[in-house]
Amino acid sequence: MAFMPPFGPQGTQQAPTAPPPQSPPPRPLTASALAVDPGAIRGCLFRNTYIWPRNGQGFWFYPTFVGRTSVSGFRWNGFFWMYSGISLDRIESFTCF
């Protein structure tokens, strides 16, 4: 069965209406061991969240769904929010506001 997050009212998820902050926050001093705990990132639902992946550059994310092994929502591409998802084991650390 394919991963299908729940949808909001009228069958669509709502992207944020404003861009995220201009600059990324300071990186946390501690990183997760193997994978981010779903309960920890669940506190960031519907909030601007900065994600540092294990590989690659960090990015702004607006999570709308947290599953056992992944999180989905909207990723800022520098111009607009795009619907996206990421596996929790690919996240090294995160901070939400």
Regions found by a protein language model. Name each.
Residues 1-55, 81-97:
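Short glycine-rich, low-complexity segments
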Residues 51, 71-75:
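SH3/SH3-like beta-barrel fold
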Residues 59-65:
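Short beta-strand-centered aromatic/proline hotspots
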Residues 66-71, 96-97:
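Short, conserved beta-turn/loop elements at beta-strand boundaries and strand-helix junctions
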Residues 67-68, 78-81:
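Short, surface-exposed beta-strand-loop junctions and turns on beta-sheet-rich folds
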